[in-house]
Amino acid sequence: MLLVAVGLVSCGDDDKPYIPELNKLTSVTCTKNGNAFFNADITYDQDKQINRIILTTEGNQFTDNYIIVDKTISVSGVKMVDGSPTNPFVHTVYTLSGNMIAAKEEKSENKYMSNAVYTAVENRYTYSSNWLKSVSQVIQWPNENGSGYQTREMGEVDRYSWENGNVVHYAYLPQQEITYEYDSQLRPENFPFRVVNSFRPVGFDMISPLNLLYGKMNQNLPTRAYWYNVSAATDICAEYTFRYTLTGDYITGMTIEEKINPVNGVTAENNTYEYAFVYNFVAEQK
């Protein structure tokens, strides 16, 4: 209705329909079987960029500050190492190409060299027409005698397959793959759901606003996902069904039913995850 009404008052060739920008996601609350699972609060700066994410999970609270300089996003905060929190430091660095993440460096502290910060994992992202297609990886670890580091090129570790504007397969090469199914329900532009490199798609990373920097997003919302080992694709290890609550133009709720199957000695398990979304960052209106 909005588009029709605006079209009636547009008179010149230069007039374009104005579609108000949707508010940005500012809070995510998730429960697992009725108990707190995680909570995330997101703030933005005056340029509508992520400024801070406070994530509370498993009784621990992590405050990450996002520092954007040119084409680099540095994330400063605390990490958990062996169950204990570190001192705050820049633990993740993203490098942008255009408006897309081209590389991600995960930092660690070298306990053999006075906690010197080093790059433990570097991910490099490959896109085709702005679709994320694959991720290659380099890992590094310190020598225990403090003499330096060892490095290993892992090559391509993640692969994404797209059909009809949606990721239908994510593969962790070469062993595992997860398949996603969709219906016609569209993903709102401000709902940052993304197929991430996980075979348990229930965490904050799959709906973090940072996902909007990984090129084109899914056109639709998934209804089901299931993963399996490539060598035994008929044995589904776990499956997930998705339901959504839509209020106006906003996804305000999501339910994920998790069914873990007794495959390869794993104990069967059923879980229900309930998500609530709040959008309190009002985009600038004309």
Predicted feature descriptions by range:
Residues 14-286:
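Buried hydrophobic residues that stabilize the cores of well-folded domains
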Residues 1-2:
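Sec-dependent signal peptide recognition
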